[in-house]
């Protein structure tokens, strides 16, 4: 009981300190790179209400035409504010135009129609690829000076779009889905919202466009082609300030190739079981502020992307000049994430003063061979994490592929398959120059995993002034230039630190603490130039036979 009170107290302290920080600190203070100030939105004094154009509250009458008329009239006047007052407002897709501020008042709720005929198939980019999907509930393309503001709620009716696995639901929740209609799989483990969705799912090897179905047949699997809820493409001067965005069909917020973007004071929610239920996916954007938001979602919370494979490399637009401060993340596959679709690169990012509570992975970096792209100059500090069920910091350059295995007996000398050698090409991803400072994690599973590639090591990763209290310790694989300075790691299971085929590893500033004797394992013929803590010696140090005798300094 005392431990529970301590954890609750820690969370409360973190939340309170975060609020104070947000109220008193310049958002640009402490940035490690040169960044132009984000150009903010400004609107004409014109104000209209959706009611002025025949809008009807109550949640049963579609207001699609009323929204369109109101926006068209405001555009002709030079722009302004479209007010959605208190009430339930059912509608089909809303298309924002330049100089429009969609203002959803406190007590107002925009609910998007579950009628799939309201959402025609359109050309989009999803998961980093050019493709075809249903039109988004809210969209803007090549617009300038647009906003969604207010304290209301915007609901994408995502439950009508998504398949759900029985194992992710309670018995009561499962029965509710089955009773709503749709189709249950033959094995009784999955609920599909429609036959169209089921056909698309069965004709696809991914959650993107069904690759086993011709383009001419896409209409027959339309329900499977779920849209992101808010699609902002090629826009400039964009503000999202205040609303709750929830229950999206796929990703919640997707700014793409957009500049001068501000996301603040938002609540972004999705059921934890929602497939592709990301919070915000920032893709090939520049000059961005994301601060004072709360995320509780079904997939990655704050995710950085820049296109996938050849499509992303041809686009050649990195996500850059981004400040992310004072955000709270509850459930999500990752709190802050880069990848895996990062083929255009990512650079110049500052992430600080964020709290992750129960997030699957805290700080997550993922890619794989074939992506290409360079991720560099990422600065992360003042991050607090609690109850993280996997890694608090995790780099995985084998995402969607086979990761190296470091368990005892699975890399026995003389009894292992030779490593395949890959050439370095434009398809080789690069992660380098990433800095962590003042990271705190407690009551979590694993502290740090740094998994690079044999042909392209993780390079220049620095962690300092940080402390971790986890079950498992630290793993470094195929890395070059890793430095830990004033890092305390208290762990309870296995090896404190494992280093495999890595070089220029400086752990002199690592303090290990365990109920057992803290141990470090050095493995791999390519391992060299390793500096260890002075107090690790004798039986606390294990060096494999294949590792050079002079690998440890």
Predicted ranges, named:
Residues 2-83, 88-101, 105-234, 241, ...:
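Extracellular "leader-to-stem" segments immediately downstream of a signal peptide or signal-anchor
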Residues 56-57, 309-313, 344-345, 371:
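Short, small-residue-enriched loops and turns at beta-alpha junctions
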Residues 79, 90-93, 113-114, 134, ...:
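Short glycine/acidic-rich loop motifs that flank beta-strands on beta-rich extracellular proteins
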Residues 88, 257, 267, 306-308, ...:
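Active-site-proximal loop/turn and secondary-structure-junction residues that shape catalytic pockets
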Residues 106-107, 144-152, 236-246, 259-271, ...:
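Right-handed parallel beta-helix
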Residues 217-219, 277-279, 311-314, 369, ...:
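Outer-membrane beta-barrel domain signature
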Residues 342, 362-382, 387-553:
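Extracellular beta-rich repeat passengers
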